[in-house]
Every structure is written in C-alpha cells, then in structure tokens.
Amino acid sequence: MDSNDKKGLKSPEIIIINGSPRINKNCSFIANEVKAMLEECGLSCKIFNIYNMDIEYCTACGFCEKTGYCKFNDDMKPLYKMFDDSKGTIVISPVHFDSISAKLKTVVDRTQAIYASKYVLNKPSIDRSKKRIGMYIAVGGVNHMIHSLKVDRL
C-alpha cells in the first residue's frame, strides 16, 4: 500500500482495481487509460495493483459476522475506508478460466466484512445512503482491442 494512504490523506474519488498478475499488459494499459480519462474530467483516481498488495485469503472464520470488520490487518483494511469515501469503484480483470483472477476473487471474498456489517449485524460499515458507481471491465488477450481503445481515445 502506498505510504500516503497510511498517513490518512484524502481517499480518491474513483478507485481502480487492477486484478491482473501481469505487469504492464492489457489490464494495466486499460487501467491507466481509464484513470487518464477520468482525471481529464476532474476526478481524483488511484489504481490499486492487487498483485502487489498484501491481501490475506478469507478463511470464513466468522469474525466479521461478530464484529463487522475483518480480523486481518493487511492492505485490504484501507480499501474498506476508500470504498466508503469514494464515488465509485472500477474493477478490471483478465478472464481466467471464464472467471476473474484468483487474487481478485480474494478481494471479493474479503468484502464479506461489508456484507456482514449490514446484513448480519444491521450496522453497515459503509454509508448506504451515498450513491456510488461501479464498473467491471473483463479483458481478453486480443491485441487489436487495445489498438481500438487507443484510436477511440484520440
């Protein structure tokens, strides 16, 4: 996690989660293009490359169902706050065996703490009255699609 995030600086308006294990490939390119477009519109954005983050697997221990938060103190912890503070989240993943990447599945599993806080404890850990946007971008390994995105960007 970036040291600025630990210092309590303002959360980005848009969180971009790159779920690819491959550095500087299609998902990274798309994440950077999306970030540039949103910043041109005046939105603050931050890309999180989850394969560079320390995120433990959910063990289904039930801790979050008793407390409303996860027992692990890892790089997921600041993301929970950013999910609450942000205007939206964009998730980008390669298609692995007709699904999302393994580490992205871990991130999804770890959002169980948010679910449990609302539906088990009736004490939502995020402000449910706040409108947010969400987007998922599935990325296949076709190089001409990247070229098309570059052309559309002009």
What are the language-model segments listed below?
Residues M1-A116, L121-P124:
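N-terminal beta1-alpha1-beta2 submodule of the flavodoxin-like/Rossmannoid cofactor-binding fold
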Residues K118-L154:
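Short, glycine-/small-residue-rich phosphate/pyrophosphate-handling segment
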